[in-house]
Each structure stands twice: as structure tokens, then as C-alpha cells.
């Protein structure tokens, strides 16, 4: 019997003496014993969990990198941990220095990691994921399963345990396992920074000499939380800002000014509905595969005080594009804004084009996986593939453990079982890539 179960039984046994009129001192003794037994049970669970994690190369690697904080623009420490691990396990490693994002004051000397077996600097198969996380850092911790103990149901919690250090750890172990059996397989690893902040790391790799024309690689396996399913594609991503200009005045005499907020509200109302309006009526496109295009007015600013007519207002909008091109979507949005404001010159719209991309279709020609279509974005479109004139076209796969539904939240977590299954999934994708030649 587990000590925790014994504690529960002891707790239940205190009810009968009370009903029989026993003195409260008996209850105090029983409660004291309950606390002691519960503490012993917790200690026993912690010792068991520690042994399970420490005895597994996969779980111990995952713990090592999850215990290192690596919020975007602060990835050098986890990068060094991975460089050390990969070097100790037979990989040649290169650091690809990546400047921090312009909107961050970090002084971190961060880098992408490019790794390959000694003597194979141009691998045919690349497994890649990201080593940065969203803020805030949440400490790594373990939770024993409820009821009968099942190793697979141990829960691993903390920032990055899912997105995407689970993929990083599982990829490495899968690669090491394959190389142990087939040491001549040209297998490489690419771990990038800043995926969570616009994909700076992948853009840096894409623009580097390692991304050749034609490519020396024929398969890319990307790691993100996909519930152990193979992703057949994800929506496109488009962002834009709307600004309104007004004239400030005392709120008691609003006719002396012009409200920027009143100017922007009908525009935002129109924007908010663009995903629900048919294209023929001026809406954004939908598709059978990705569903409807969705828009999120994520930030809205305006005004100085409640008793002042606002002279400025602005909004930032994110679009998850289900079909069509970026240019078409921008034109639809521009027309919708112009119609909503009657062509007012007080309204302006801007697009940060460098971060926009259309829907991304991915390869799924490997048997044995359930398929999934996702709404979230990745840095897959940030890697330009120069295979236009090549006889062999590059395959792109997206797979990983955990679910995106908890990935950025306070309860980010996955089970030991899912993490271990991911190693088998990546191994299956590697095997398929090897068969391609």
C-alpha cells in the first residue's frame, strides 16, 4: 500500500471515535500521525520521481534544459548547456551568433546551435526546434500520478516543458539512438533562438551560408507541440496597426475637438467581422482545410484622461489567414478600413510586412500518424528553401509532444509517457527520411 493511501485511511478512521465520544486528544494524535504519514508519502514520491528522471537520458536531458531560464533574447545559458551535452555525445557543434531583437535591451550573447556527427557537416536530414520560451519563467517540477502509480502518467510542469524543450530533448535522443545503430546516417540538429518573438533565429539561419542553393538537405523535421500528431499545415500570419488622429479639447465642449476614439471605433467594428463576411462582400477568405480566417484586436490605446477629447488612438491586430496571399489580404483590409471611415485621412493603416506569411502546407507522407491542422504559427515559413531548380524537393514535417493549449499558460505541462512516445515518433520520421536517400 502507498503511504499516501495509508494516510487517507487514517484520516477516515478518526470519524468513528468522535461519534463514540472519545476525547479530542485521540483526534489530535490521529491528525498528527496523518501529517507525518503524508509527509513521508510525499518524500517517498519525490525520491521515486527523482530516480525515474535521473535514470533516463531523455528525462534528465529534458529536466536540465527546462531548469535553465531561456525567455526570448536570453537564450545563451540553455544554449551552452546543449552545446556541452551534444559535444559529450559525439556531435560537432557550431554557434551561430544572433543579435538580440531591436526592441529588447538584453545584452545576452545568444546563438543558434548547428550540430552534426563528426565529419558530416552537410547532413541530409535536419531536426529543428527552438530553445526560447515566452515569459515568465516557471520552475520545473514533477507531480506523481493520482491513484495507482504509472510511470507514464508522471506530469512534468514548468515553462518550456512543452513548448518546445520537449521537442528539443526528444529529437536529440531520437537522433542519438539512430546514430548508434547507423553511424553513417547524415543527420543534423538545428536549435534556434527567438521563435517566440518573430523567428529571428530561423531568419538568421535562412540568410546564412548554411542555407545553400540548392539545399544540401532533403528533409526538415520541425518540433512543436502537436499532440503527437503529424501536422498537415498551419494558418498564415498577418499583423497590422490602425491609427486615428483627432483634436484634443475639454470634454465639456467636445465640439471644439475631434475624438480619435470615435473615429477608430467603426473601423475596428468592421475589422472585427472580416473573418465572418464572404469574400464577395468584402471579407477575408476561408478554406476547407483551415476553416475561416480569424482576427484578434489584441491592443487598443487612446486618450489622455476621461475628461479630455482624445487626440490619438491606435489598435494592433493579428490575423490568422486561412487562404489567399498576403497581398490580397492586405488589399481587402485596406478597402474595409476605407469603407468604414468613409475615406477619412485621419485614419492610417500600416503592415509590418516582414513578419507576414500565407498558410503553410506541410508534408504528411509517413504512415502511422494521426493528422492535425493547427491555427498557431511557427518559424517554418522563415526558412527559405532554394530547391526550385533541384530534382529533389525538400520535405517539411511538423511533429512533437504536448498540446499547444497549455503551452504559454501557467499550467504548461506534459506527461512522461507523451515525451517518451515523441522519441519513437521522431525515430519513425527519421527512418522515412533515410529511405528517401
UniProtKB/Swiss-Prot annotation:
Q: Which residues are glycosylated?
A: 153, 346
Q: Which range is the signal sequence, renumbered to this chain?
A: 1-20
Q: How is the cofactor bound?
A: Binds 2 Zn(2+) ions per subunit.
Q: What InterPro entries has UniProt attached to this entry?
A: Bact_exopeptidase_dim_dom, Peptidase_M20, Peptidase_M20_dimer, Peptidase_M20A
- UniProt keyword list: Glycoprotein, Hydrolase, Metal-binding, Protease, Secreted, Signal, Zinc
Catalytic class of the enzyme: hydrolase
Cofactor dependency: Zn(2+)
One Gene Ontology term, aspect cellular component: extracellular region
- What are the binding positions for Zn(2+) 1 in this chain? 163, 196
What is the annotated localization of this protein?
Secreted
User: Gene3D superfamilies recorded for this chain?
Assistant: 3.30.70.360, Zn peptidases
Q: Name one GO biological process term.
A: proteolysis
Where, by residue number, does Zn(2+) 2 bind?
163
Annotated active site residues, numbered on this chain, are: 195
Q: Which CDD domains match?
A: M20_ArgE_DapE-like_fungal
User: Which Enzyme Commission number(s) are on file for it?
Assistant: 3.4.17.-
Q: Name one GO molecular function term.
A: peptidase activity
Family the UniProt entry places it in: Belongs to the peptidase M20A family.
Which PANTHER family does this UniProt record tie to the protein?
ACETYLORNITHINE DEACETYLASE (PTHR43808), PEPTIDASE M20 DIMERISATION DOMAIN-CONTAINING PROTEIN (PTHR43808:SF8)
* Official protein name in the record: Probable carboxypeptidase HCBG_00059
Q: Which organism is it from?
A: Ajellomyces capsulatus (strain G186AR / H82 / ATCC MYA-2454 / RMSCC 2432) (Darling's disease fungus)
What is the phylogenetic placement of the source species in the record? Eukaryota, Fungi, Dikarya, Ascomycota, Pezizomycotina
